[in-house]
Regions:
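Short glycine/proline- and charge-enriched loop/turn segments
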Residues: 42-44, 148-154, 196-202
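Short catalytic/ligand-binding loop motif for oxyanion handling, primarily in non-cytosolic enzymes
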Residues: 5-7, 35-38, 80-82, 102-105, ...
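Mid-to-C-terminal alpha-helical segments outside catalytic/metal-binding sites
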Residues: 166-181, 189-231
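Short aromatic-enriched loop/helix-cap "lid" or pocket-rim segments at secondary-structure transitions
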Residues: 38-41, 107-109, 145-149, 193-195, ...
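Active-site glycine-centered loops adjacent to acidic/histidine catalytic or metal-binding residues
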Residues: 185
Length: 231
């Protein structure tokens, strides 16, 4: 992590480079801003105007200049702010984590379908930015409103797909397999779903994809974006 607004950002990035001994690839400076939203298990504490902050934008631009990536976690109502950032800084590779976290608790608990419909439009617009990649996972967090963390037994892979496959399918349709990477979001999602169950569900969901397409989403895109030399 690094606060991308820092005037001494290069000093911090240099320290990361040195400590990582060639394995440093990018920064995740979360943008999730909960404000006064009630009922969140993991409330994001970022500045609501972070994405338009001049110092922050300069920091994100600096990542691109250094060949580093920018990851963000934010809420569904902030995806438009992220799109503006991505359009303004096309030279920086950006990764949208956790589907943009469509919330489903508190004031959003009874708006799931309306939020989903707006989310679909926003994801389609975000995918129009060629420098943006989608990290698909993290929907089992309590704040997404599926309630699995409150059950006595976790969901099966079929239950997982019944509830969440439409999010994955839409994101893949918008971004294409060349810009999607699957994630577990563990240990956070461990509150709601088993690790093997999650990955088995993703394997079931992608059963009709070609081997090449599956390789991209399960590993290839991540290897390319984060420059991982898998030997």
């Amino acid at each position: 992590h690094a606060d991308l607004r820092l005037a001494q950002l290069d000093d911090v990035l240099n320290a990361h480079e040195e400590a990582a001994e060639g394995l440093f690839r990018g920064i995740r400076h979360a943008g999730a801003s909960a404000g006064d939203i009630q009922g969140l298990a993991i409330p994001g504490g970022s500045d609501r105007n972070l994405m338009s902050n001049e110092a922050f934008r300069a920091g994100v631009a600096r990542l691109g200049e250094r060949g580093l990536t920018y990851d963000t976690w934010l809420y569904h109502f902030q995806i438009n702010d992220f799109m503006e950032l991505a359009r303004a800084l096309p030279a920086t590779t950006m990764i949208l984590d956790h589907f943009g976290t469509p919330l489903g608790v508190g004031e959003f608990a009874h708006q799931k379908e309306a939020i989903f419909e707006q989310w679909k439009e926003d994801i389609e617009c975000a995918a129009a930015c060629p420098n943006v990649f989608a990290k698909l996972g993290g929907l089992a967090m309590p704040d997404n409103g599926f309630g699995w963390h409150e059950r006595s037994t976790p969901p099966s892979s079929d239950e997982f797909l019944e509830a969440q496959a439409r999010y994955y399918e839409h994101a893949i349709a918008c971004f294409g397999v060349e810009r999607c990477m699957f994630e577990s979001n563990f240990p956070v999602d461990r509150l709601s779903i088993g690790y093997r169950v999650l990955w088995n569900g993703l394997k079931k969901m992608t059963s009709d994809f070609s081997e090449e397409e599956k390789d991209l989403m399960f590993s290839g895109v991540a290897r390319r974006v984060y420059r991982i030399d898998a030997k």
